[in-house]
């Protein structure tokens, strides 16, 4: 990932 993690990864 670039800088910020997408929330979809933390909340499938």
Swiss-Prot record:
Keywords: Antibiotic, Antimicrobial. Active between pH 2 and 12. GO terms for biological process: defense response to Gram-negative bacterium; defense response to Gram-positive bacterium. Active between 37 and 90 degrees Celsius. Activity is reduced at 100 degrees Celsius and absent at 110 degrees Celsius. Activity is unaffected by storage at -20 degrees Celsius. Has bactericidal activity against E.coli ATCC 29522 and S.aureus. Inhibits growth of S.marcescens and B.cereus ATCC 14579. A synthetic peptide has antibacterial activity against E.coli ATCC 29522 (MIC=8 ug/ml), S.aureus (MIC=64 ug/ml), S.marcescens (MIC=32 ug/ml), B.cereus ATCC 14579 (MIC=64 ug/ml), B.subtilis (MIC=32 ug/ml), L.plantarum ATCC 8014 (MIC=32 ug/ml), B.flexus (MIC=32 ug/ml), S.enteritidis ATCC 13076 (MIC=4 ug/ml), Enterobacter spp (MIC=32 ug/ml), B.anthracis (MIC=128 ug/ml), B.licheniformis (MIC>128 ug/ml) and L.lactis ATCC 11454 (MIC>128 ug/ml). A synthetic peptide has no antibacterial activity against S.agalactiae ATCC 12386, S.epidermidis, P.aeruginosa and methicillin-resistant S.aureus (MRSA). This is Antimicrobial protein AN5-1. It comes from Paenibacillus alvei.
